[in-house]
């Protein structure tokens, strides 16, 4: 098949949507498909264009057999709701000339639109209509719902317009996929028939991310004694994620210097969180940059306890991608989730970690006390078993490929 992917994030971004889209593109190319991607300069999660891509306009490169068309965009130094809108629309403006160029090239069989941003779908839908391709919309985050529930957009007319635009794009899609059951319910409630829906969860390469010993972790590199306890948060440090509770909870462990809080990543809240820890005199709270993929197994093995923290308003609109790696590494996570959401249900049903109330430093401190004072081996064993059974990269991508083949009635050569 010839597959064209539209998405604002792609490799070499190490985390978030770009990681998964990049791995998907590379996997399809490895199966012999002709794959191209229209994407932005890499900028996430640092919100800073990577050095190797600075000062360039529209470029083309090959990554793991995939033709990658990069377009310029505006990346704000400080992310606000208004600046994020400008950021996304600047990307759409950059896509326009490349879109026209693609219309003149050999037709693609499948167009995959990765959302957010959801309005990128207008380019994908238009291409599919004009060239007779099949369109699949893959939803990593219900962006308009999130903007409403997080209070980022409060104007009713604007929200109505956005929901109508979203419905139009969903109606034009030949298939719609998402990453969790909670998102599926919301998507079906928008009028998408179940026959068009495809479950396509985020995955993990369980052959790469696997349990390691403490001796194989980053403890020696970071000067952390093997007998000490480590609480790890790794990922995007966004302003709206409520990560202050990590610092607040760490204050409860001030008199336990053998308990280390490691915050690994970048984002708009990093400097503020570091300032909070410094002002509180919390020397056991340490900050490190996001680690490269090849160090991820060692990073995950460093922790006794992992933190997966979400705000209440996130509910089932997003599914934390960091959890897949934690489970594959056989890690025990403290997860903040609202009862009834997919995240809560999965964690509870399979007993994969410790569930706490979101946005509560008290609940986090209590969960940490529990985690640091009991044998976590059963949690770790169940986590790895779950990853092997439900999150296998090869298994999930093969299943998704089968859906694409059905859409195009393409007989894959074996």
Region spans (language model):
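Conserved donor-binding/catalytic core segment of Leloir-type glycosyltransferases
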Residues: 225-241, 247-250, 262
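A charged, aromatic-enriched C-terminal amphipathic alpha-helix characteristic of glycosyltransferases
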Residues: 359, 363, 377-405
